[in-house]
Amino acid sequence: MAIRPDTHESTLADSRTEEKLERPRMWRVLLHNDEYTTQEFVVWVLESVFHKPAAEAFAIMMSVHRSGVGLAGVYTHDVAETKLNATRRLAEEHEFPLLVTMEPEAEPEDRIH
């Protein structure tokens, strides 16, 4: 006698509805210029917290110095928040008023073409 598969039982694949995975929203971590935080400290933060190579850290620091703000990196919310808090903690420990903020990256449909 042949064993017949149960025709009433659906497979897991059949019972699942297709889920569309979306990329998480990304966040920009920004460093802001001030008159007291040294350029060397900003470079050190970019190298140690944001893992930037020395040349890139220097270029970002110069952007902060010249334009008043510079992009340290773009990350998921949790990573951005962790890097923001680490930067604030280091600035406080070294008695610098370095301002670091985060803002949501523009969604593709939000961008102007």
Model segments located where?
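Terminal domain-initiation and capping elements
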Residues: 1-113
